[in-house]
């Protein structure tokens, strides 16, 4: 059994950790506002890319290519009493969709959990292989 499986599963753990951190950042900033639509927090999303390996056509893991900001417009709300409002009384809220972020959080958590199970299964198989000679 190839020990490459631990590298592959480890790359998935790392990628899903970035995804969870991004979700946490989006949720933490979901209620922040600004008087300037260009200064308001924008939802972020990680971009994943397969790691190419000519020696292993079955796959070699995943890497985070980067984190991109959503291009959706900020939400404009009329709040003239808000100290952060612009001269017309508007504040701008992030383009964070709470429901979508919760779905992303659950999905990332499940993917992370699956990768941990892959590592545990590979470890158990390796231990059983070592015990064959006893």
Give, region by region, the residue ranges found by the protein language model.
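Amphipathic alpha-helical polymerization modules
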Residues: 1-134
């Amino acid at each position: 059994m190839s020990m490459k499986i631990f590298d592959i599963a480890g790359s998935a753990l790392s990628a899903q950790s970035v995804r969870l951190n991004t979700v946490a950042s989006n949720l933490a900033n979901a209620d922040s506002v600004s008087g300037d639509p260009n200064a308001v927090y924008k939802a972020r999303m990680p971009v994943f890319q397969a790691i190419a390996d000519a020696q292993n056509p079955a796959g070699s893991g995943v890497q985070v290519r980067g984190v991109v900001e959503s291009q959706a417009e900020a939400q404009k709300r009329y709040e003239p009493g808000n100290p952060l409002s612009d001269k017309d009384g508007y504040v701008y809220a992030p383009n964070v969709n709470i429901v979508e972020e919760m779905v992303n959080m659950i999905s990332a958590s499940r993917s992370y959990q699956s990768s941990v199970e892959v590592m545990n299964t590979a470890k158990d198989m390796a231990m059983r292989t070592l015990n064959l000679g006893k």
